[in-house]
Amino acid sequence: MTSPALKDPAKTRVIVGMSGGVDSSVSALLLMEQGYQVEGLFMKNWEEDDGTEYCTAREDLADAQAVCDRIGIKLHTANFAAEYWDNVFEHFLEEYKAGRTPNPDILCNREIKFKAFLDYALSLGADLIATGHYVRRRDTGELTELLKGLDPNKDQSYFLHAVGGKEIARTLFPVGELEKPEVRAIAEKHGLATAKKKDSTGICFIGERRFSDFLKQYLPAQPGEIQTTEGEVIGRHHGLMYHTIGQRQGLGIGGLKDAGDEPWYVLHKDLARNVLVVGQGNEHPWLFSRALLASEIFWVNPIDLSSPRRLTAKVRYRQGDQQCTLERTENGYRAMFDEPQRAVTPGQSVVFYDGEVCLGGGVIETAEPWSPRQ
Protein backbone atom coordinates (compact mmCIF):
# COMPACT_ATOMS: atom_id res chain seq x y z
CA MET A 1 0.00 0.00 0.00
CA THR A 2 1.46 3.34 -1.03
CA SER A 3 1.06 6.16 1.47
CA PRO A 4 -1.09 9.04 0.15
CA ALA A 5 1.72 11.42 1.14
CA LEU A 6 4.05 9.97 -1.48
CA LYS A 7 2.01 11.28 -4.41
CA ASP A 8 3.14 14.23 -6.51
CA PRO A 9 2.50 17.37 -4.39
CA ALA A 10 1.15 19.27 -7.39
CA LYS A 11 -1.59 16.64 -7.70
CA THR A 12 -2.27 16.37 -3.97
CA ARG A 13 -5.01 18.40 -2.30
CA VAL A 14 -4.27 19.10 1.37
CA ILE A 15 -6.65 20.72 3.86
CA VAL A 16 -4.84 22.25 6.83
CA GLY A 17 -6.51 22.49 10.22
CA MET A 18 -6.19 26.23 10.86
CA SER A 19 -6.43 27.03 14.57
CA GLY A 20 -5.59 30.71 14.31
CA GLY A 21 -2.15 30.02 15.78
CA VAL A 22 1.33 30.38 14.36
CA ASP A 23 2.04 26.64 13.98
CA SER A 24 -0.89 25.86 11.68
CA SER A 25 -0.28 29.14 9.82
CA VAL A 26 3.30 28.20 8.99
CA SER A 27 2.22 24.64 8.17
CA ALA A 28 -0.09 25.96 5.45
CA LEU A 29 2.63 28.27 4.13
CA LEU A 30 5.26 25.52 3.97
CA LEU A 31 2.91 23.19 2.10
CA MET A 32 2.21 25.96 -0.40
CA GLU A 33 5.95 26.36 -0.93
CA GLN A 34 6.29 22.60 -1.43
CA GLY A 35 3.77 22.73 -4.27
CA TYR A 36 0.70 21.16 -2.68
CA GLN A 37 -2.85 22.29 -3.47
CA VAL A 38 -3.61 23.84 -0.10
CA GLU A 39 -6.84 24.92 1.58
CA GLY A 40 -7.55 25.70 5.22
CA LEU A 41 -10.31 24.65 7.59
CA PHE A 42 -11.21 26.31 10.89
CA MET A 43 -13.15 24.09 13.27
CA LYS A 44 -15.29 25.30 16.13
CA ASN A 45 -15.56 22.67 18.83
CA TRP A 46 -17.32 24.49 21.66
CA GLU A 47 -20.56 26.44 21.91
CA GLU A 48 -21.01 28.96 24.71
CA ASP A 49 -24.56 29.42 25.99
CA ASP A 50 -23.93 32.62 27.94
CA GLY A 51 -22.94 34.94 25.12
CA THR A 52 -19.25 34.92 26.02
CA GLU A 53 -16.33 33.59 24.03
CA TYR A 54 -13.94 32.01 26.49
CA CYS A 55 -12.33 29.99 23.73
CA THR A 56 -11.51 33.18 21.77
CA ALA A 57 -13.06 31.42 18.77
CA ARG A 58 -14.03 34.67 17.06
CA GLU A 59 -10.52 36.09 17.35
CA ASP A 60 -8.94 32.80 16.27
CA LEU A 61 -11.18 32.59 13.20
CA ALA A 62 -10.24 36.15 12.24
CA ASP A 63 -6.54 35.31 12.56
CA ALA A 64 -6.95 32.14 10.51
CA GLN A 65 -8.79 34.11 7.81
CA ALA A 66 -6.09 36.80 7.78
CA VAL A 67 -3.38 34.17 7.26
CA CYS A 68 -5.31 32.41 4.51
CA ASP A 69 -5.90 35.75 2.77
CA ARG A 70 -2.20 36.56 3.07
CA ILE A 71 -1.00 33.33 1.48
CA GLY A 72 -3.90 33.13 -0.97
CA ILE A 73 -5.83 30.03 0.04
CA LYS A 74 -9.48 29.29 0.71
CA LEU A 75 -10.67 28.87 4.31
CA HIS A 76 -13.50 26.48 5.11
CA THR A 77 -15.27 26.47 8.47
CA ALA A 78 -16.89 23.55 10.26
CA ASN A 79 -18.72 23.17 13.54
CA PHE A 80 -17.90 19.99 15.46
CA ALA A 81 -19.39 21.16 18.76
CA ALA A 82 -21.90 18.29 18.89
CA GLU A 83 -19.21 15.69 18.24
CA TYR A 84 -16.96 17.33 20.81
CA TRP A 85 -19.69 17.30 23.45
CA ASP A 86 -20.61 13.65 22.82
CA ASN A 87 -17.14 12.17 22.35
CA VAL A 88 -14.87 14.38 24.45
CA PHE A 89 -16.65 16.57 26.98
CA GLU A 90 -19.06 13.99 28.40
CA HIS A 91 -16.13 11.63 28.95
CA PHE A 92 -14.22 14.49 30.60
CA LEU A 93 -17.08 14.97 33.08
CA GLU A 94 -17.45 11.25 33.75
CA GLU A 95 -13.76 10.98 34.58
CA TYR A 96 -13.89 13.87 37.04
CA LYS A 97 -17.06 12.42 38.54
CA ALA A 98 -15.12 9.18 39.11
CA GLY A 99 -12.33 11.05 40.89
CA ARG A 100 -9.78 10.89 38.08
CA THR A 101 -7.94 13.69 36.28
CA PRO A 102 -8.52 13.36 32.51
CA ASN A 103 -6.70 14.95 29.60
CA PRO A 104 -9.32 16.11 27.06
CA ASP A 105 -6.69 17.15 24.48
CA ILE A 106 -5.81 13.51 23.83
CA LEU A 107 -9.42 12.53 23.22
CA CYS A 108 -9.97 15.66 21.12
CA ASN A 109 -7.11 14.67 18.83
CA ARG A 110 -8.43 11.14 18.38
CA GLU A 111 -12.13 11.94 18.04
CA ILE A 112 -12.18 15.42 16.49
CA LYS A 113 -8.98 16.43 14.72
CA PHE A 114 -8.10 13.01 13.34
CA LYS A 115 -11.63 11.68 12.91
CA ALA A 116 -14.34 14.32 12.47
CA PHE A 117 -12.00 16.80 10.75
CA LEU A 118 -10.29 14.10 8.68
CA ASP A 119 -13.61 12.65 7.51
CA TYR A 120 -14.95 16.11 6.68
CA ALA A 121 -11.81 17.05 4.75
CA LEU A 122 -11.97 13.83 2.75
CA SER A 123 -15.63 14.57 1.97
CA LEU A 124 -14.48 17.90 0.52
CA GLY A 125 -12.17 16.03 -1.83
CA ALA A 126 -8.91 16.29 0.10
CA ASP A 127 -6.23 13.65 -0.33
CA LEU A 128 -4.56 14.54 2.95
CA ILE A 129 -4.95 16.77 5.98
CA ALA A 130 -2.22 18.67 7.79
CA THR A 131 -1.90 20.06 11.30
CA GLY A 132 0.53 22.24 13.19
CA HIS A 133 1.53 19.54 15.67
CA TYR A 134 5.19 19.13 16.57
CA VAL A 135 5.46 15.48 15.54
CA ARG A 136 6.87 13.64 12.54
CA ARG A 137 5.77 10.64 10.51
CA ARG A 138 7.78 7.90 8.90
CA ASP A 139 6.51 5.56 6.21
CA THR A 140 7.90 2.03 6.56
CA GLY A 141 6.46 -0.32 3.97
CA GLU A 142 2.77 -0.74 4.80
CA LEU A 143 2.92 1.14 8.11
CA THR A 144 3.16 4.81 8.98
CA GLU A 145 4.91 5.48 12.28
CA LEU A 146 4.44 8.46 14.58
CA LEU A 147 7.75 10.03 15.64
CA LYS A 148 8.61 12.64 18.23
CA GLY A 149 8.90 16.20 16.98
CA LEU A 150 12.45 17.38 16.34
CA ASP A 151 12.16 20.12 18.99
CA PRO A 152 12.24 18.29 22.36
CA ASN A 153 10.71 21.31 24.09
CA LYS A 154 7.66 21.21 21.80
CA ASP A 155 7.27 17.52 20.94
CA GLN A 156 3.53 16.74 21.02
CA SER A 157 3.58 13.00 20.38
CA TYR A 158 2.27 12.51 23.94
CA PHE A 159 -1.02 14.10 22.86
CA LEU A 160 -1.26 12.15 19.58
CA HIS A 161 -0.53 8.67 20.95
CA ALA A 162 -4.16 7.53 20.56
CA VAL A 163 -4.31 8.38 16.85
CA GLY A 164 -4.02 5.31 14.63
CA GLY A 165 -1.39 4.74 11.98
CA LYS A 166 -4.02 4.84 9.22
CA GLU A 167 -4.96 8.37 10.27
CA ILE A 168 -1.30 9.39 10.61
CA ALA A 169 -0.78 8.13 7.04
CA ARG A 170 -3.37 10.67 5.87
CA THR A 171 -1.68 13.56 7.68
CA LEU A 172 1.26 15.87 7.07
CA PHE A 173 3.09 17.61 9.92
CA PRO A 174 5.10 20.41 8.28
CA VAL A 175 6.52 21.98 11.48
CA GLY A 176 7.52 18.66 13.05
CA GLU A 177 11.02 19.01 11.60
CA LEU A 178 11.43 22.55 12.95
CA GLU A 179 12.07 24.23 16.27
CA LYS A 180 9.63 26.82 17.57
CA PRO A 181 11.90 29.87 17.02
CA GLU A 182 12.28 28.83 13.37
CA VAL A 183 8.50 28.64 12.99
CA ARG A 184 8.03 32.15 14.38
CA ALA A 185 10.84 33.47 12.17
CA ILE A 186 9.17 32.03 9.06
CA ALA A 187 5.84 33.58 10.05
CA GLU A 188 7.45 36.96 10.64
CA LYS A 189 9.41 36.84 7.39
CA HIS A 190 6.18 36.29 5.44
CA GLY A 191 4.15 38.85 7.36
CA LEU A 192 1.68 36.40 8.87
CA ALA A 193 -0.72 37.90 11.40
CA THR A 194 -0.01 35.11 13.87
CA ALA A 195 3.78 35.54 13.95
CA LYS A 196 3.86 36.91 17.50
CA LYS A 197 0.64 35.38 18.80
CA LYS A 198 1.03 33.60 22.13
CA ASP A 199 0.65 29.84 22.22
CA SER A 200 -2.67 28.68 23.59
CA THR A 201 -2.49 27.04 27.01
CA GLY A 202 -4.97 25.19 29.17
CA ILE A 203 -8.25 23.61 28.15
CA CYS A 204 -10.07 25.46 25.36
CA PHE A 205 -13.56 25.30 26.79
CA ILE A 206 -12.44 26.63 30.17
CA GLY A 207 -10.35 29.52 28.85
CA GLU A 208 -9.58 32.16 31.45
CA ARG A 209 -12.10 30.94 34.01
CA ARG A 210 -11.09 29.34 37.28
CA PHE A 211 -11.24 25.60 36.79
CA SER A 212 -13.33 25.05 39.94
CA ASP A 213 -15.87 27.67 38.82
CA PHE A 214 -16.25 25.94 35.47
CA LEU A 215 -16.50 22.41 36.83
CA LYS A 216 -19.19 23.18 39.40
CA GLN A 217 -21.50 24.29 36.57
CA TYR A 218 -21.71 20.64 35.54
CA LEU A 219 -20.89 18.51 38.59
CA PRO A 220 -22.13 18.92 42.17
CA ALA A 221 -19.27 19.36 44.64
CA GLN A 222 -18.97 16.92 47.52
CA PRO A 223 -17.00 18.51 50.38
CA GLY A 224 -15.10 16.26 52.76
CA GLU A 225 -12.21 15.95 55.15
CA ILE A 226 -8.52 16.57 54.54
CA GLN A 227 -6.47 14.05 56.49
CA THR A 228 -2.81 13.27 57.05
CA THR A 229 -1.45 9.79 56.33
CA GLU A 230 -1.95 9.06 60.04
CA GLY A 231 -5.65 9.88 59.77
CA GLU A 232 -5.55 13.23 61.55
CA VAL A 233 -8.19 15.65 60.23
CA ILE A 234 -6.49 18.97 59.42
CA GLY A 235 -9.00 20.67 57.12
CA ARG A 236 -11.87 20.42 54.66
CA HIS A 237 -11.87 20.13 50.88
CA HIS A 238 -14.57 21.45 48.55
CA GLY A 239 -14.57 18.33 46.37
CA LEU A 240 -12.03 15.67 45.38
CA MET A 241 -12.55 16.55 41.72
CA TYR A 242 -10.80 19.89 42.26
CA HIS A 243 -7.56 18.21 43.31
CA THR A 244 -4.89 16.12 41.64
CA ILE A 245 -2.00 14.00 42.89
CA GLY A 246 1.09 16.09 43.68
CA GLN A 247 -0.89 19.34 43.90
CA ARG A 248 0.55 21.94 46.27
CA GLN A 249 -1.47 25.11 45.69
CA GLY A 250 -5.00 25.77 46.87
CA LEU A 251 -5.24 23.29 49.74
CA GLY A 252 -6.02 25.92 52.37
CA ILE A 253 -3.79 24.28 54.96
CA GLY A 254 -1.70 26.49 57.18
CA GLY A 255 -0.93 27.55 60.70
CA LEU A 256 -1.03 24.02 62.08
CA LYS A 257 0.68 23.51 65.40
CA ASP A 258 3.88 21.41 65.22
CA ALA A 259 3.49 21.02 61.43
CA GLY A 260 6.69 22.80 60.49
CA ASP A 261 7.26 24.95 57.42
CA GLU A 262 7.32 22.32 54.68
CA PRO A 263 4.50 22.69 52.13
CA TRP A 264 1.61 20.23 51.94
CA TYR A 265 0.95 18.06 48.88
CA VAL A 266 -1.96 15.91 47.74
CA LEU A 267 -0.85 12.29 48.16
CA HIS A 268 -4.02 10.30 47.60
CA LYS A 269 -7.73 10.67 46.86
CA ASP A 270 -9.73 8.20 48.94
CA LEU A 271 -12.89 7.99 46.84
CA ALA A 272 -14.68 5.53 49.09
CA ARG A 273 -14.43 7.86 52.10
CA ASN A 274 -14.37 11.15 50.13
CA VAL A 275 -11.13 12.02 51.94
CA LEU A 276 -8.19 13.99 50.56
CA VAL A 277 -4.95 12.58 51.99
CA VAL A 278 -2.06 15.04 52.23
CA GLY A 279 1.51 15.08 53.48
CA GLN A 280 4.43 17.45 53.81
CA GLY A 281 7.45 17.60 51.55
CA ASN A 282 8.13 17.44 47.82
CA GLU A 283 9.80 14.05 48.33
CA HIS A 284 7.10 12.45 50.47
CA PRO A 285 7.27 8.65 49.95
CA TRP A 286 3.56 8.45 49.07
CA LEU A 287 4.20 10.62 46.00
CA PHE A 288 6.33 7.94 44.32
CA SER A 289 5.27 4.85 42.38
CA ARG A 290 7.16 1.85 41.07
CA ALA A 291 4.55 0.70 38.55
CA LEU A 292 1.20 1.54 37.02
CA LEU A 293 -1.72 -0.28 35.47
CA ALA A 294 -3.58 0.74 32.31
CA SER A 295 -6.71 -1.20 31.36
CA GLU A 296 -6.60 -0.36 27.66
CA ILE A 297 -3.87 0.90 25.36
CA PHE A 298 -4.33 2.51 21.96
CA TRP A 299 -1.49 1.48 19.68
CA VAL A 300 -0.55 3.62 16.70
CA ASN A 301 0.31 0.34 14.98
CA PRO A 302 -0.04 -3.22 16.34
CA ILE A 303 2.89 -4.41 18.47
CA ASP A 304 3.89 -7.80 19.85
CA LEU A 305 3.51 -8.02 23.62
CA SER A 306 3.52 -11.81 23.94
CA SER A 307 6.42 -11.34 26.36
CA PRO A 308 7.50 -8.36 28.51
CA ARG A 309 9.14 -5.59 26.50
CA ARG A 310 11.70 -2.96 27.43
CA LEU A 311 10.51 0.50 26.41
CA THR A 312 10.54 4.08 27.61
CA ALA A 313 7.46 5.92 28.83
CA LYS A 314 6.12 9.31 29.86
CA VAL A 315 3.44 9.71 32.53
CA ARG A 316 3.01 13.41 31.79
CA TYR A 317 3.70 15.88 28.98
CA ARG A 318 7.29 17.12 28.71
CA GLN A 319 8.60 14.46 31.04
CA GLY A 320 11.90 12.89 30.02
CA ASP A 321 11.90 9.31 28.78
CA GLN A 322 11.59 6.85 31.67
CA GLN A 323 12.95 3.31 31.32
CA CYS A 324 10.34 0.65 31.99
CA THR A 325 9.22 -2.90 31.30
CA LEU A 326 5.73 -3.28 29.83
CA GLU A 327 3.75 -6.52 30.01
CA ARG A 328 0.22 -7.77 29.41
CA THR A 329 -1.71 -8.87 32.49
CA GLU A 330 -5.16 -10.31 33.12
CA ASN A 331 -6.40 -6.80 33.89
CA GLY A 332 -4.68 -4.90 31.08
CA TYR A 333 -1.13 -3.63 30.97
CA ARG A 334 1.48 -3.13 33.70
CA ALA A 335 4.48 -0.83 33.34
CA MET A 336 7.27 -1.37 35.89
CA PHE A 337 9.73 1.53 36.06
CA ASP A 338 13.46 1.40 36.75
CA GLU A 339 13.28 4.61 38.80
CA PRO A 340 10.58 5.98 41.15
CA GLN A 341 7.92 7.99 39.33
CA ARG A 342 6.50 11.05 41.07
CA ALA A 343 2.79 11.92 41.16
CA VAL A 344 1.49 9.20 38.84
CA THR A 345 -2.12 10.30 38.38
CA PRO A 346 -5.11 8.05 37.54
CA GLY A 347 -6.96 9.46 34.54
CA GLN A 348 -3.82 10.89 32.95
CA SER A 349 -2.08 9.03 30.14
CA VAL A 350 1.03 6.90 30.03
CA VAL A 351 2.65 6.94 26.59
CA PHE A 352 5.21 4.39 25.39
CA TYR A 353 8.16 4.88 23.07
CA ASP A 354 10.79 2.82 21.29
CA GLY A 355 13.49 5.40 20.70
CA GLU A 356 11.90 8.24 18.75
CA VAL A 357 8.87 6.16 17.73
CA CYS A 358 5.66 6.79 19.67
CA LEU A 359 4.05 3.37 19.98
CA GLY A 360 0.83 4.36 21.76
CA GLY A 361 -0.49 4.71 25.26
CA GLY A 362 -3.44 4.49 27.58
CA VAL A 363 -5.20 5.92 30.59
CA ILE A 364 -3.59 5.24 33.98
CA GLU A 365 -5.98 3.27 36.18
CA THR A 366 -3.90 2.77 39.31
CA ALA A 367 -0.36 3.31 40.54
CA GLU A 368 1.65 0.96 42.74
CA PRO A 369 3.49 2.70 45.59
CA TRP A 370 7.29 2.63 45.55
CA SER A 371 7.41 1.80 49.25
CA PRO A 372 4.78 0.09 51.42
CA ARG A 373 2.16 2.38 52.92
CA GLN A 374 1.42 1.88 56.58
UniProtKB/Swiss-Prot annotation:
Domain of life per record: Bacteria
Protein's cellular compartments: Cytoplasm
Gene3D superfamilies hit by this protein: Adenine nucleotide alpha hydrolases-like domains (2.30.30.280), HUPs (3.40.50.620), Translation factors (2.40.30.10)
Annotated stretches, region: Interaction with target base in tRNA: 103-105
Keywords: ATP-binding, Cytoplasm, Disulfide bond, Nucleotide-binding, RNA-binding, Transferase, tRNA processing, tRNA-binding
Binding site for ATP: G17, M18, S19, G20, G21, V22, D23, S24, M43, G132
Keyword Cytoplasm appears in the UniProt entry: yes
Enzymatic reactions: S-sulfanyl-L-cysteinyl-[protein] + uridine(34) in tRNA + AH2 + ATP = 2-thiouridine(34) in tRNA + L-cysteinyl-[protein] + A + AMP + diphosphate + H(+)
Active site: residue positions: C108, C204
GO biological process, alphabetically ordered: tRNA wobble position uridine thiolation
Cysteine pairings via disulfide bonds: C108-C204
HAMAP family registered for this protein in UniProt: tRNA_thiouridyl_MnmA
PANTHER family assigned to the protein according to its UniProt record, in alphabetical order: MITOCHONDRIAL TRNA-SPECIFIC 2-THIOURIDYLASE 1, TRNA 5-METHYLAMINOMETHYL-2-THIOURIDYLATE -METHYLTRANSFERASE
Biological role: Catalyzes the 2-thiolation of uridine at the wobble position (U34) of tRNA, leading to the formation of s(2)U34.
Protein name: tRNA-specific 2-thiouridylase MnmA
Species for this entry: Pseudomonas entomophila (strain L48)
